[in-house]
Regions:
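Cysteine-centered catalytic environments shared across enzyme families
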Residues: 1-335, 346, 549-550, 555, ...
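Adenosyl-5′-phosphate
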Residues: 1-3, 22-23, 88, 165, ...
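Generic recognition of stable, solvent-exposed alpha-helical segments in well-folded globular domains
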Residues: 19, 236, 240, 244, ...
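Short catalytic/ligand-binding loop motif for oxyanion handling, primarily in non-cytosolic enzymes
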Residues: 80, 132-134, 143-144, 164, ...
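Short aromatic-enriched loop/helix-cap "lid" or pocket-rim segments at secondary-structure transitions
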Residues: 299-300, 327-328, 372-377, 571
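Short secondary-structure boundary/capping segments
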Residues: 330-332, 375-382, 643-646
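Acceptor-substrate binding/catalytic loop of class I
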Residues: 338-340
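Active-site adenylate/phosphate-handling loop in enzymes that bind or generate adenylated species
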Residues: 348-410, 499-522
């Protein structure tokens, strides 16, 4: 992966625009530590920091050809097939890079080329003939792209921190964005947690012209216009899943640098590592996270799978102190409040990967969303059962079956709370947004910490209107579980997991994550399968488990799902007492200075733990600890001056000014 920046329609002198690109890129150097370059044209300027993966010699950016310029963050995995298609149409190529294929395809087909790309990317494409700048993002929002209008120009960047280099500008937290992010774990549409900064939506392109208003094109929407369910048997679906997933892995192994795998110990990464092993002829490395705290540790299963495949397993052992000491660094890279500490071990793992000489890793990300592995899918079925059979004696057993990894639900008092929770939703179990409502219900505890003037009078109506604006036209034709998949992908996956835990943490150390389960052909096919193939009764990821049952250890195939988590509130205690980081960032003075939370409410929360760590901490307190602390860290970091370099320190491979040359 890489990092990109751009300036459009600025009225400054060319040399001034070139000078501004440099400090913007310096703030993104971690995304592309190998090389950097800039190009300045008439009314437009583009910059790029490169993580070299394909065509290491000739793939430098900005890439220029035929009056077109491209800066591009990501990969198009089917570039070999696209190259052959374009050559058959009479096109010729000067390099082996996928970057040139993307540029030629965009020049020839315009925005329609985006639907031909199988990959994860964000890009800025300047066409001098039409004098238009196209900004585009991949189907599922794997790679970020932001834009900001300021003093007559539009600025673009892979991360918002690059905008802090703009004269007379400083990022500030948007209260509405913070509220929406807190309730949904994401902001919807183009909104971000920062005032004035917009995120390009996944699956869209925006075309900026010198004399016209920007035009937005949506080239992809999950499930839109897709007939379902597909005909065919479960046995046929297993064969097809294996074939399509193997092809997704094959495409994502294309690289001119070494490729490794993440191995968590769950079935998702075990499958991608298995298929990698089948497709490769050489021995490769797998990387894993082990925890000092046995409640989170899955190293037994990681070692089992590594031994089964005879791969080299490299592990990092995570302690509470490592989480605590690296929390602020993770927040700086994430650029948003965190709801848990899970990103920090991934940040540290990426450092180990880079030190091992690996720049690309395949992971099992997104399998839970597309194959229905989350508890949320089972919760919907449980709600339906409770509504239909209100007097069933199976209710207690169903709750314990639903949450086997949460030991405290075995306690009678906790079960009573769970029963009240579910009964409170019985009247709306058939509401098409009930899955999202469950998450919002859990997160409304955050409202106790926000000033009252930050909340809309009709909060539920405001939020539901925001959600419904993002729904596809044929939404009502989908099953309830398909609707929940869409909502999970648009909120939790796209806005949080792919950003805070994936893109930002891996690229903090110049490591590109690739996600076979997000292959769009695979995902669209799975979306059309009958619901019972993916979740019969309460059997999560049933199709995936049965497809690979013969190839994986039964202990991995049949083990209850253990969500990837890390110690949250517990990690911020030192010597049995609440530690320095929490006490300083959540002090009354610090909270008042940031002006985002009710200082008295935050002080009551901190006071709950003044005497030490309680024996049990629930979901809400863990979530609150991470959210309150990380929001305060974001606010503090926004006030800190940049002390890094004024330009990237790697070799400059492109430096062109095509307007006002001296």
């Amino acid at each position: 992966m890489c990092g990109l920046v751009g300036i459009f329609a600025g009225n400054s002198a060319p040399w001034a625009r070139r000078a501004l690109l440099e400090p913007m890129l310096a703030r993104l150097q971690h995304r592309g530590p190998d090389a950097w370059g800039t190009w300045v044209g008439s009314g437009v300027a583009l910059g790029h920091v490169r993580l070299s993966i394909v065509d290491l010699v000739a793939g430098h950016q900005p890439f220029l050809r035929d009056d077109c310029v491209l800066v591009y963050n990501g990969e198009v995995y089917n570039h070999i097939e696209l190259r052959a298609e374009l050559e058959a149409l009479g096109e010729h190529f000067q390099t082996r890079s996928d970057t040139e294929v993307v540029l030629v395809a965009l020049r020839r087909f315009g925005s329609q080329a985006l639907a031909r790309f199988n990959g994860q990317f964000a890009l800025l494409f300047w066409n001098a003939r039409t004098r238009t700048l196209t900004a585009a993002r991949d189907r599922y929002g794997v790679r970020p792209l932001y834009h900001l209008e300021h003093q007559g120009a539009v600025y673009f960047a892979s991360e918002t921190k690059a905008f802090d280099a703009i004269p007379n500008y400083r990022r500030a937290i948007c209260p509405e964005g913070l509220l929406e992010h807190g309730l949904l774990w994401n902001t919807l549409g183009t909104r971000t947690v920062f005032k004035g900064i917009q995120s390009l939506e996944a699956g869209t392109a925006v075309v900026f012209g010198a004399t016209e208003s920007p035009k937005t094109y949506r080239y992809h929407q999950l499930g839109e216009g897709t007939p379902h369910p597909l005909p065919g048997s479960f046995a046929e679906a297993k064969v097809q899943l294996r074939s399509m997933l193997a092809n997704a892995v094959r495409l994502r192994l294309r690289s001119d640098v070494p490729v490794g795998n993440y191995l968590s110990g769950g079935i998702d990464s075990s499958v991608t590592t298995l298929l990698t092993d089948e497709l490769r002829t050489d021995r490769f490395q797998a990387f894993a996270i082990a925890f000092e705290d046995g409640a989170y540790d899955e190293s037994h299963y990681q070692q089992m799978m590594a031994k089964r495949l005879n791969v080299d397993l490299v592990s990092i052992r995570i302690t509470d102190a490592l989480i605590r000491d690296n929390f602020e660094k993770a927040v700086w890279h994430a650029e948003r409040p965190l709801f848990r500490t899970a990103p920090i071990p991934l940040l540290l793992l990426a450092e180990v990967v880079r030190a091992a000489g690996i720049r690309v890793v395949l992971t099992g990300e997104a399998a839970d969303e597309i194959l229905w592995g989350y508890d949320a899918f089972k919760e919907l079925k449980l709600l339906r059962f409770w509504a239909k059979f209100p007097n069933s004696k199976l209710r207690p057993q169903l709750i314990r079956t639903l949450y086997p990894h949460l030991a405290h639900y075995r306690d009678g008092r906790q079960f009573g709370l769970m029963r009240m929770f579910y009964e409170g939703f019985l009247g709306s179990y058939d509401n098409d947004l009930v899955g999202l409502n469950l998450r919002v219900h859990n997160n409304k505890i955050l409202l106790n910490y926000l000033p009252r003037d930050c909340r809309p009078a009709d909060l539920d109506g405001w939020l539901l209107d925001r959600v419904r604006q993002s729904l596809p036209p044929d939404w009502q034709q989908w099953s309830l579980l398909r609707k929940n998949q869409f909502l999970e992908m648009r909120t939790l996956l796209q806005g949080y997991l792919l950003s805070s835990q994936a893109d930002r943490m891996s690229l903090a150390h110049g490591v590109e994550g690739r996600y076979p389960f997000l292959d769009h052909e695979l995902l669209e096919w799975l979306f059309q399968l009958p619901d019972q193939f993916k979740l019969p009764l309460l059997s999560q990821k049933h199709l995936l488990r049965e497809t690979f049952r013969a190839n994986l250890p039964s202990e991995i195939v049949d083990r209850p799902k253990q969500p990837y988590q890390a110690p949250d509130l517990k990690a911020f205690f030192e010597g049995g007492r609440l530690g320095k980081l929490m006490n300083e960032r959540l002090s009354p003075d610090a909270v008042a200075a940031a002006g985002l939370f009710d200082a008295a409410a935050v002080e009551r929360f901190r006071g709950k733990f003044a005497r030490g760590m309680p024996p049990q901490v629930g979901y809400r307190d863990n979530m609150l600890a991470s959210f309150l602390l990380s929001t305060q860290v974001v606010a503090a970091q926004l006030q800190q001056p940049w002390t890094g370099p004024v330009r990237p320190s790697s070799p400059r491979t492109v430096d062109l000014i095509e307007e006002g040359k001296p």
